[in-house]
Amino acid sequence: ILQAASQLLCQKTFAAMTMDDVADAVGIAKASLYKHFSSKDDLCCAAVVQMLSQVRAYLETLEPEAAPLEKLRAVVRWSLQRLLAQEIPEWPGSHSPLRTMLREHHDCLIEWLPVSQCLEQWIAQAQQQGALDAALPPRVVLHILYARACDPAAGFLQDAGLYDNAEIVELVLRTSFDGLAARASAAEL
């Protein structure tokens, strides 16, 4: 049920998804679905909690000795790969009822907090090492990385068909971590 809800969140968004859609995707009666989840809100929150637990599990697979910047890049890479495979949805916009609901849902906050703390720790370490701009507040960097991990631009690039998914991931990583400014060529150095 949660997998179907996640897929539908990716394909249709929260506003367009219905409990009928989920019941049809799972192959059960709508009444049976309501035995598990009392509302679409509860179902979608449970799907997001499951996704966040997958993120936490992924964080635990990263080598503790790896450089903090490399761990941050790995998390964004992993998230973008999941986004392009429609395994995780784009993050809802600021006016989305889903975003408001997720911010108020206890289980979402319980899953979200350790992820944010881990990423903020890596951000602070990367700043101390000079790998990230230390003038930027860590919370700003955190939210920029969250935005990149659920960036609709990746989907736009995918829809255009000019790049394969691996190229899109690398392009988003490059613009996110290296910026848009022109680089000095080897001849200029």
What residue ranges belong to the model's regions?
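Short secondary-structure transition hinges
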Residues: L80-E120, V140
